[in-house]
């Protein structure tokens, strides 16, 4: 059976950065992996950030966003069925930062998916300097994503003080209490600078598994509490952007019958760096 891992992380926690490192370890081991970007947004920015992982041992897939929850679940199920035929050793699922984790477990229990996949690990990434003043809805999302995790990985721990890390863990446990979950985190917390991770650290994460846990559900309507905003190439001035655009339009290769074939090349050439 194909191992399947769920990597959750509250908004801005750094889970995409973690997945790049986690996936690279698997690739270096020789595993054949698939990464499924499972996002509600109409634009999947995280998939663009993972593009450099693509190769013989790693393929990226995504679920088209911009649909309701039921449609999203059907697309998730369909994509897993297709990926189950690709011969992967492991599939890594990266959901949005406001994901209902029950979707993952419910779909994995469906036939024929339950005969093809075995749940490996649920890992939750939490910012070591977690904002203390979160709304009830944000605390719920934080707790619901962490409740079933085999391991909580703190991001940016090298930038946090011991007091900030202590406060983050306390906040996480308070969020668990708010959703009437009996679980409290201590030994499951992984605190280490990601740049210093060794093979043994990744192997520990690969063996963390997951924890079946119950908590009180909160119904949150789509768009009720969070909206997606995209800020890209903010280091460019208006004049620099205009100059780059003019160069693209002046490029003769971008016109004519060969336009379709050269479009990708021209986009690379005019990329704002």
Annotate each language-model stretch with its function.
Residues 1-2, 222:
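Extreme N-terminus of proteins, especially the signal/transit-peptide cleavage junction
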Residues 24, 53-57, 79-81, 112, ...:
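Short, low-complexity, polar/charged sequence segments that are solvent-exposed and flexible
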Residues 83, 98-184:
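Conserved C-terminal guanine-recognition region of P-loop GTPase G domains, centered on the G4
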Residues 151, 159-273:
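C-terminal accessory "lid"/substrate-recognition subdomains
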Residues 27-28, 85-86, 146-147, 255-256, ...:
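Flexible, charged surface loops at secondary-structure boundaries
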Residues 2-8, 13, 17-135:
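Nucleotide-state-sensitive switch-loop elements of NTP-binding domains
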Residues 33-34, 62-66, 88-89, 119-122, ...:
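Short, surface-exposed, polar/charged, turn-prone segments marking secondary-structure boundaries
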């Amino acid at each position: 059976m194909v191992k399947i891992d769920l990597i959750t992380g509250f908004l801005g926690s750094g889970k995409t950065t973690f997945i790049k490192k986690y996936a690279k370890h698997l690739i270096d081991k020789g595993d054949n992996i698939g990464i499924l970007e499972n996002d509600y947004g109409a634009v999947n920015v995280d998939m663009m950030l993972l593009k450099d992982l693509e190769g013989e041992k790693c393929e990226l897939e995504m679920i088209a966003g911009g649909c309701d929850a039921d449609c999203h679940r059907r697309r998730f199920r369909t994509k897993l069925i297709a990926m189950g035929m690709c011969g992967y050793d492991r599939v890594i699922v990266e959901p949005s930062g406001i994901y209902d984790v029950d979707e993952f477990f419910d779909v994995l229990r469906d036939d024929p998916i339950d005969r093809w996949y075995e749940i490996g690990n649920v890992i939750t990434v939490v910012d070591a300097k977690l904002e203390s003043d979160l709304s009830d809805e944000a605390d719920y999302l934080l707790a619901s994503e962490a409740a079933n995790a085999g391991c909580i990985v703190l991001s940016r721990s090298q930038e946090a003080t011991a007091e900030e890390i202590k406060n983050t863990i306390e906040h996480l446990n308070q969020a668990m209490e708010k959703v009437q979950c009996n679980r409290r985190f201590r030994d499951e917390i992984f605190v280490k600078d990601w740049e210093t991770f060794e093979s043994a650290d990744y192997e520990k994460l690969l063996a963390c598994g997951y924890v079946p846990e119950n908590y009180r559900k909160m119904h949150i309507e789509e768009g009720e509490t969070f909206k997606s905003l995209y800020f890209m190439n903010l280091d460019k001035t208006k004049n620099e952007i205009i100059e780059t655009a003019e160069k693209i339009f002046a490029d003769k290769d971008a016109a004519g019958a060969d336009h379709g074939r050269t479009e990708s090349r021209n986009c690379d050439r005019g990329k704002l760096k």
